[in-house]
Amino acid sequence: MGTFRRRRRFLLAALVTFALLHLFSASSIVSADGRWIGQRTGSDLPGGFIRSNKRFGGPGSSPPTCRSKCGKCQPCKPVHVPIQPGLSMPLEYYPEAWRCKCGNKLFMP
């Protein structure tokens, strides 16, 4: 009975330690203003050395390549358009999708 309690206490302590380490390591990577700790701007660097920051895209998908999707119509550019389901009344939320637009016409990418 004593070994079971000791083992359970050890597993609980290990689990709590692991959870705390994970929490503190994840929060130490990002500072309060949302920048990565290792990320520096040009004004932070000595001697006026400017470094370009690699920025990641926001949430959602990336625009498609619209080459040769609009036939002979030019310019063919990607646009975000709302996709409304076939309901009689408009919804507050409906999904958006990428389409290729040329003039007033939309084409599937």
UniProtKB/Swiss-Prot annotation:
In Pfam terms, one family for this protein is: EPF
Coiled-coil residues: none
Arranged from A to Z, the UniProt key words for this protein are:
Developmental protein, Disulfide bond, Secreted, Signal
Cellular component terms per the entry's GO annotation: extracellular region
Tissue specificity is:
Expressed at the base of the apical meristem at 3 days after germination. Not detected in the hypocotyl. Expressed in developing stems soon after bolting, in inflorescence stems and in young siliques.
Asked whether the UniProt record includes Aminoacyl-tRNA synthetase among its keywords, one would answer no
Its assembly, as annotated, is: Interacts with ERECTA.
Q: What does this protein do?
A: Acts primarily as positive regulator of inflorescence growth. Endodermal expression is sufficient for proper inflorescence architecture. Redundantly involved with EPFL6 in procambial development regulation. Controls stomatal patterning. Mediates stomatal development inhibition. TMM (AC Q9SSD1) functions to dampen or block CLL2 signaling. Acts as a growth-regulatory ligand for ERECTA family receptors.
Family per similarity comment: Belongs to the plant cysteine rich small secretory peptide family. Epidermal patterning factor subfamily.
- Protein's UniProt name: EPIDERMAL PATTERNING FACTOR-like protein 4
Question: Where does this protein come from, organism-wise?
Answer: Arabidopsis thaliana
Q: Which gene encodes it?
A: EPFL4
